[in-house]
Amino acid sequence: MLLKVDNATKRFGGLVANDHLNIEIEKGSIVGLIGPNGAGKSTIFKSICGFNRIDEGNIFFNDQRITHKETYKIARLGIACTFQQAQLFANITLEESVLMGAYCHQHSKKKALEIAREKIAFVGLAGHENQQVSRLNMFERKRAELAAALATQPELLLLDELFAGLVPTEVGEMRLLVKRVNEELGVTLFIVEHVLRVIMSLCTKIYVLEYGKMIAAGTPNEITSNPEVIKAYLGEDYDGTSDKRS
């Protein structure tokens, strides 16, 4: 098992954001996490990456306990993440931004630069290396953040609403790119997303959160036919093609 979340609970004061969550992700898989806004999806992502410290339970990566490890140590072990709002420094170039990710494992500037340029090309931004991040459009910025995450050479990549704000043609392109990350680079993916047609087409397993509790887990077909999931999130009129925004 590549990642195991064992009874993880996270509280913010009196609010229980994650309530005894259990998640298992096998190496090479693409797994989804869905649920209404405020369900606790981003909270568990941040806990896995080390930005939050869970109050109860444990998190294991490659059978190693990473509960409460520092973020940079978790990154060096092989976990990377992207955020809904691209977390890039606006006043530096694309190449410099991705290079920062490459230095996670590389001390050689030459090798790090080689990795950075390789990932920039992989996400389709070759030729933009010297462009300031602030001048990139949303679709380009999301691909730039993906390149920076890939430059850390992760085994597991957490994608938090990577498709948010993209127009349908961009969603299609990004979906193919994400599929290539898994198939060509061998990176295991854990995806939080409201664009359900993406989740349903990419993932072999999906977890569903509501009010911090896990209410379902299964294949896309099992999830879309689950009465509790339909009531809590999908809605009675869900036809398998529409997307959720709340």
Task: Tell where the protein language model's regions lie, with residue ranges.
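Glycine-rich phosphate-binding loops of nucleotide-dependent enzymes
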Residues: 2-4, 8-246
